[in-house]
Amino acid sequence: MKIIFVRHGHPNYADDCLTPLGRRQARAAAERLKDAKIDRFYSSSCGRAYETACYIAELHGGAAVKKLDFMREISWGIEGTSDHTHPWDLADRRVAEGKDVMDRDWQNDPDYAGHTLLRSYLAVAAAFDRWLDELGYRREGNYYRVTRENRDVLLLASHGGSSSAVLAHAFGLPFGFVCHALRPGFTAITEVSLEGEVGALISPTFLLANDIEHIKSLSDPSDYNN
């Protein structure tokens, strides 16, 4: 099985939809993926992600897009305080301060332990595992047991935070490292493969990460992921 992750296009966050630039980016992503074999289309239930997925599905015969609530954007901040530090800013701050973004025990670090994003991360990770279980991949420790054959290609349009959370979990990587290293741009395409014989214990593999070549002619670089 292969999952094609696509971040939503440039958003109007207030109205949870795409801006004119975001729609151009979504159309560019659709054109980029028009010849890809995609069996099923999914998105988070947020409007900006669903709209992005619909542009892509339109070039695949207008296929239906199924919404997944668990892939909505994660929350962050420390409740009861004015600290609403974005996960990417938090990761960058840790690097600037010389802290280890590869710490395997990151969930117990004070920077994360009291942070709303940790609860969001854990909820998204657990729901993602339940979804994969339905698709034939059962979580065992840090890996996945193949429980049935599945050669489908799935498209999943979502968000920078929720996609980084599930990728960090699936690959057993610290969330802060994925935030700092991957940084998905608008309509960035990341492809992940889960392959193995039925009964095998497997780990996913990256086929492509954060591909935004299709939007580089549309706007200034400052509009790629802000």
Map each language-model feature to its residues.
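Acidic, low-complexity terminal tails and accessory targeting/binding regions
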Residues: 62, 74-90, 138, 142-153, ...
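Short, well-ordered beta-to-alpha junction loops that form the rim of enzyme active sites
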Residues: 45-46, 70, 148-161
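Extreme N-terminal starter segment of soluble prokaryotic enzymes
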Residues: 1-4
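Extended, charge-rich low-complexity interaction segments
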Residues: 95-112, 213-226
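Internal catalytic-core helix/loop-beta-alpha segment
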Residues: 107-143
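Short catalytic helix/loop segments, enriched in acidic residues and glycine
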Residues: 18-33
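Active-site metal-binding loops of divalent metal-dependent hydrolases
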Residues: 9, 46, 160, 210-212
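Phosphate-coordination/substrate-recognition cap region in phosphate-metabolizing enzymes
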Residues: 30-106
